[in-house]
């Protein structure tokens, strides 16, 4: 789905930007926020003993306090860790900042029973930022920034560098159906990242629209799972088969959380439009 960089949260700045009550029930706002900030800084000391579920629990509440209700797009299909974090935050909905901070503090206490927030903190060095507080994410792998000379066609595809990809395909330097180690072709990647125009370019160059990766998933599976309705519609119009199943037996409409996309796929399959000749639909994008 598009794939974002490492999610970083700073422990500085105003909490509860998403809107919190002006008065807390049991603790003053200043006291509660101070304890929350201390807990966020202490996370780096207990991250190694926390389970994945606990880290996700902390992450979601940290984001709820710092940002408020989840306001970012769902991460890409390849970004498993990012999706889990997004889902944990999204599930909180309009959760109150007070409750989120209290639960965050209590969870840190459970991870380290000997720790308790202090009334006043001693001067400290700025901590590294992290998953649910300070520290590099335990679940997210950092992607290196590649030098231009080190990039390959898949890097240009992920970046939506249409000019580079088009030139490589037009000159025959690259096979449009070349696949990576996981069997994912350029069309898989473009669908995953939501690059609609690039998808059109790849289809114009005769990309295999029903190509399956090592998991048996087609570009249509990717576009459906990542919830890009425009790309789903584009693929269907160009002959994508919505009845193909992946290695787990799932069709594209079964891997999406979007009711609209699922309905679109099921309706298309019912009318048999996937048999429409793709050659009649291909046009070079402007």
UniProtKB/Swiss-Prot annotation:
One of its GO terms (molecular function) is fatty-acyl-CoA binding. Disruption phenotype: CRISP-Cas-mediated knockout results in gastrulation failure due to reduced cell movements. Animals surviving to free-feeding stages have craniofacial abnormalities, decreased head size, structural brain abnormalities, eye abnormalities, and decreased movement. Proteomics analysis shows decreased protein N-myristoylation. Residues 32-117 form the ACB domain. GO terms for cellular component: cytoplasm; nucleus. PROSITE patterns: ACB_2, ANK_REP_REGION, ANK_REPEAT. It is found in: Cytoplasm; Nucleus. Residues 1-24 are annotated as: Disordered. Keywords: ANK repeat, Cytoplasm, Lipid-binding, Nucleus, Repeat. ANK repeats lie at residues 182-211, 215-244. Residues 8-22 have a biased composition (Low complexity). The keyword Nucleus applies. An acyl-CoA binds at residues 59-63, 85, 104. InterPro entries: Acyl-CoA-binding_protein, Acyl-CoA-binding_sf, Ankyrin_rpt, Ankyrin_rpt-contain_sf, FERM/acyl-CoA-bd_prot_sf. Binds long-chain acyl-coenzyme A molecules with a strong preference for unsaturated C18:1-CoA. Does not bind fatty acids. Plays a role in protein N-myristoylation. This is Acyl-CoA-binding domain-containing protein 6. It comes from Xenopus tropicalis. The gene is acbd6.
């Amino acid at each position: 789905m598009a794939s974002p960089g490492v999610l970083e949260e700073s422990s500085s700045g105003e909490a509860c930007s998403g809107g919190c009550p002006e008065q807390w029930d049991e603790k003053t706002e200043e006291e509660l926020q101070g304890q929350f900030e201390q807990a966020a800084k202490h996370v780096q000391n207990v991250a190694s003993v926390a389970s994945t579920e606990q880290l996700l629990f902390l992450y979601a509440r940290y984001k709820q306090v710092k940002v408020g209700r989840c306001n970012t797009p769902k991460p890409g299909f390849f970004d498993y860790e990012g999706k889990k974090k997004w889902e944990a935050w999204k599930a909180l909905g309009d959760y109150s900042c007070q409750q989120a901070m209290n639960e965050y503090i209590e969870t840190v206490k459970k991870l380290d029973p000997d720790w308790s927030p202090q009334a006043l903190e001693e001067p400290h060095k700025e901590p590294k930022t992290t998953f649910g507080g300070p520290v590099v994410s335990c679940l997210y792998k950092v992607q290196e920034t590649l030098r231009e000379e080190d990039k390959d066609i898949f890097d240009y595809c992920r970046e939506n560098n249409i000019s580079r990809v088009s030139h490589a395909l037009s000159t025959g330097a690259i096979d449009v159906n070349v696949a990576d180690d996981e069997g994912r072709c350029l069309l898989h990647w473009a669908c995953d990242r939501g690059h609609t125009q690039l998808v059109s370019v790849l289809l114009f160059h005769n990309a295999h629209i029903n190509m399956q990766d090592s998991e048996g998933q087609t570009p249509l599976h990717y576009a459906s799972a990542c919830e890009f309705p425009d790309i789903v519609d584009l693929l269907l119009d160009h002959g994508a088969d919505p009845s193909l199943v992946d290695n787990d037996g799932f069709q594209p409409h079964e891997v999406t959380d979007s009711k609209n996309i699922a309905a679109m796929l099921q309706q298309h399959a019912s009318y048999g439009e996937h048999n429409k000749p793709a050659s009649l639909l291909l046009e070079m994008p402007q």
